[in-house]
Swiss-Prot record:
Gene3D superfamilies: PEBP-like (3.90.280.10). Present with 6230 molecules/cell in log phase SD medium. One of its GO terms (biological process) is regulation of Ras protein signal transduction. One of its GO terms (cellular component) is cytoplasm. This is Uncharacterized protein YLR179C.
């Protein structure tokens, strides 16, 4: 199953363009769903208006023994296509960070992500520039280092390039800088053909 997930991530160059050379192991399925809309299925297109409120997220490990009650998880959401897939002067844009998500299994064997942990950066719904093509909105679930004090994690005070000041910087840098271990991923695509946004960059 993990190889199938990696294949779908590779289909739209998610690994090449975001996590790059990071070593990782997909340990389960990261499920993302928005109200009154289709579930996110590793690359399906979504209407922009359906994604403005924070989604419901859960994680279902392939093997529960790989995550213990002592572990804490972090969720990241990023847009590597800002302002477009061919122009990266604003990328990546940080859309969401939650840390300290507890590993607590529900009746169905999944771990609830929504409503858990500490929100470090509030959810920002997709708002790509008009006629800039499809943007990839990528969710990463990571395991925090055991015993880590997440208050010392990098503070993302500027969502453009995750505050690193270099076009193309983002989730990769945050994961590496805070010694996180990538264990799950999902993504969807949004295109804006109707709304002119005024960006204060």
């Amino acid at each position: 199953m993990s190889s199938a997930i990696v294949a779908k991530l590779n289909k739209e160059d998610i690994i090449k363009d975001t996590v790059k050379d990071l070593a990782f192991e997909i340990l389960g399925e990261l499920s993302v769903s928005y109200v009154d809309s289709d579930d996110i299925k590793l690359g399906n297109p979504m209407p922009m208006e359906a994604t403005q409120a924070a989604p419901t997220i859960k994680f279902t490990p392939f093997d529960k023994s790989q995550l213990s009650a002592e572990d804490k998880l972090a969720l990241l959401m990023t847009d590597p296509d800002a302002p477009s897939r061919t122009e990266h002067k604003w990328s990546e844009v940080c859309h969401y960070i939650i840390t300290d998500i507890p590993v607590e299994y529900g009746p169905g064997g999944d771990i609830a992500i929504s409503g858990k942990g500490v929100v470090r950066n509030n959810y920002i719904g997709p708002g790509p520039p008009k006629n800039s093509g499809y943007h990839r909105y990528v969710f990463f679930l990571c395991k925090q280092p055991k015993g880590a004090d997440s208050s010392t994690f990098t503070k993302v005070e500027n969502i453009i390039s995750w505050g690193y000041g270099t076009p193309g910087a983002g989730a990769y840098d945050y994961i590496k800088e805070n010694n996180l271990q990538l264990v799950g991923a999902n993504y969807y695509m949004v295109e804006n053909t109707t709304v002119d946004f005024n960006y204060d960059m």
